[in-house]
Swiss-Prot record:
Transmembrane segments: none
Disulfide links within the chain: none
Active site location: C150
Protein's name in the database: Glyceraldehyde-3-phosphate dehydrogenase
Organismal lineage: Eukaryota, Metazoa, Chordata, Craniata, Vertebrata
Ion transport among keywords: no
Modified residues (S-nitrosocysteine): C150
C-alpha cells in the first residue's frame, strides 16, 4: 500500500485522511501544517460539523497524531522543500494547501524525499486526471499531477457518457455550489472579485468556475465545446451540476437515462451514480461517488436539446477520488 503525506490539514486534507482510514486504499504516514499544532489536529480531525464525529480513536501520543492505533508523523514547515517526507516514509504527497498548485511549486515536495505529488485542486500546468474518465492515460513519467476540481469530477463522468453515446455539439454548465472556506461570513474585501466578498450565508452569489473548460482537458474531444459558471448558495456542503447540452444524435430522455444507468451500474460504478428517488442536497452528504445523476430532475426540450442534473458531495466525494487516484498511480509503479 502506498505511503502518503498530506500537506495542509484543511477541509480536503482532513477528509482525504478520513477517506484513507475508511477505505484503506492508501496509508497516511505524515501530515504537515504550519498553522495547526498537534493537539488542535486531534480536535479538528475528531470533530466535523459537516460529516460528524470520527468514529474511531484519535489522540496525540509521543509527538505523533495517532488514529485508530496508527501513528502519523507531524510537521509544521511553511516551505514545502523543508518537509522531510522521506524520513516518515511518504512516497506520495497530497498537496492540499491550495497554494502550491503549479508543477514548479508542487515539485518542492520532491526535495524532501517524496516521489510523486497529487495536487488536490485544478492546476495551470500539471496534467489533470479524473477517475473513471481519463485515469488510464496516467503514466510513470509524471511526478506532479492534479486531481482537478470537485466540480470537474462531477461533470466529466456524465459528459463522457453523454458524448460517447450521443455526441455533445456544445453545452453550458451551472453548478449550484455549497459554501467553501474561501468565502466571507459577512461582507468583506475580496480583491477584484467583488461579489465573492459578500456574506456567504446571506446570498446567492454568481461566481466563475473553470470546471467546464477543464473537462476539455480531460476529454480532448470536448475541448472548446463546454463552459460554465457557478452560483454559491448558503448550504454547508453538497453541490449540484446542471448541464445543458445540444446533442448531435437525437435521443429521447428515457434513452439518456438508460445509458447513464448502464454506465453507473457498469464501467463507472463507484464513480457515477444514478437515482430515480425524490432526493434533495442533504441526501448526498457523505456520498463517496463523484457524480450522482438525478433522473427525475432533468428535462428535454426536444431530441437534441437537454438539461441534465447530477449531484456531488463536493468535499467527501472528491477526497475519495484523491485516494483512488493515488491507488491507481501506485498500481503502475
Amino acid at each position: 500500500m502506498v505511503k502518503v503525506g498530506i500537506n495542509g490539514f484543511g477541509r480536503i486534507g482532513r477528509l482525504v485522511t478520513r477517506a484513507a482510514f475508511l477505505t484503506k486504499k492508501v496509508e497516511i504516514v505524515a501530515i504537515n501544517d504550519p498553522f495547526i499544532d498537534l493537539d488542535y489536529m486531534v480536535y479538528m480531525f475528531q470533530y466535523d460539523s459537516t460529516h460528524g464525529k470520527y468514529k474511531g480513536e484519535v489522540k496525540a501520543e509521543g509527538g505523533k497524531l495517532v488514529i485508530d492505533g496508527h501513528a502519523i508523523t507531524v510537521y509544521s514547515e511553511r516551505d514545502p522543500a523543508n518537509i522531510k517526507w522521506g524520513d516518515a516514509g511518504a512516497t506520495y504527497v497530497v498537496e492540499s494547501t491550495g497554494v502550491f498548485t503549479t508543477i514548479e511549486k508542487a515539485s518542492a515536495h520532491i526535495k524532501g524525499g517524496a516521489k510523486r505529488v497529487i495536487i488536490s485542486a485544478p492546476s495551470a500546468d500539471a496534467p489533470m486526471f479524473v477517475m473513471g474518465v481519463n485515469h488510464e492515460k496516467y503514466d510513470n513519467s509524471l511526478t506532479v499531477v492534479s486531481n482537478a476540481s470537485c466540480t470537474t469530477n462531477c461533470l466529466a463522468p456524465l459528459a463522457k457518457v453523454i458524448n460517447d453515446n450521443f455526441v455533445i455539439v456544445e453545452g453550458l454548465m451551472s453548478t449550484v455550489h455549497a459554501i467553501t472556506a474561501t468565502q466571507k461570513t459577512v461582507d468583506g474585501p475580496s480583491g477584484k472579485l467583488w461579489r465573492d466578498g459578500r456574506g456567504a450565508s446571506q446570498n446567492i452569489i454568481p461566481a466563475s468556475t473553470g470546471a467546464a473548460k477543464a473537462v476539455g482537458k480531460v476529454i480532448p474531444e470536448l475541448n472548446g465545446k463546454l463552459t460554465g459558471m457557478a452560483f454559491r448558495v448558503p448550504t454547508p456542503n453538497v453541490s449540484v451540476v446542471d448541464l445543458t447540452v445540444r446533442l448531435e444524435k437525437p435521443a429521447k430522455y428515457d434513452e439518456i437515462k438508460k445509458v447513464v444507468k448502464a454506465a453507473a451500474d457498469g464501467p463507472m460504478k463507484g464513480i457515477l451514480g444514478y437515482t430515480e428517488h425524490q432526493v434533495v442536497s442533504t441526501d448526498f452528504n457523505g456520498d463517496c461517488r463523484s457524480s450522482i445523476f438525478d433522473a427525475g430532475a432533468g428535462i428535454a426540450l426536444n431530441d437534441h436539446f437537454v438539461k441534465l442534473v447530477t449531484w456531488y458531495d463536493n468535499e467527501f466525494g472528491y477526497s475519495n477520488r484523491v485516494c483512488d487516484l493515488m491507488a491507481h498511480m501506485a498500481s503502475k509503479e
